Amino acid sequence: RFLIPIFLILHFSLNAIEYNLSWYPKDNYFDSINTPTNLKYSLINTDGVWEDNKGSYGVMNCLVSLLTKNSKETELNGLCQANDESKDEAKFWITLKRNSLETTGVGKITYIAVTGIYKKVIGMSCPYAVTYVQKTYAIIKQKCSVEFFNKLN
């Protein structure tokens, strides 16, 4: 009698998996304008491969703008298109937003347009963290809720 509720709790706990996506972009194009007042505006075109914990993978391309104040605080806005090479040629488009230090930081990804298996996550947002490697490479880790993960099933 007591085993059934315990089994159900364990079953749902074990199946409560967050969605994780890792992206490894490289900057292809970078241009910036600097002012004498330590204000810098930059445009970046970047792309790289991505993978998630559901076994999906593909290529993501982004256009990103950065406004940096006093050589530290950065306001980042980007628009990306990702192709899923593993699932019925699905695609998703996301926005990147971040206000943090130029060299590292935490921001928010929002799914603004989707096809295929991603249709149920349109409008959802997830936090992401970025770490830069050298000057042109990055590691971006996105972590989404269990609800997000379940909508991809």
Task: Please place each PLM-identified region on the residue numbering.
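N-terminal signal peptide c-region/cleavage motif recognized by signal peptidases
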Residues: H11-S13
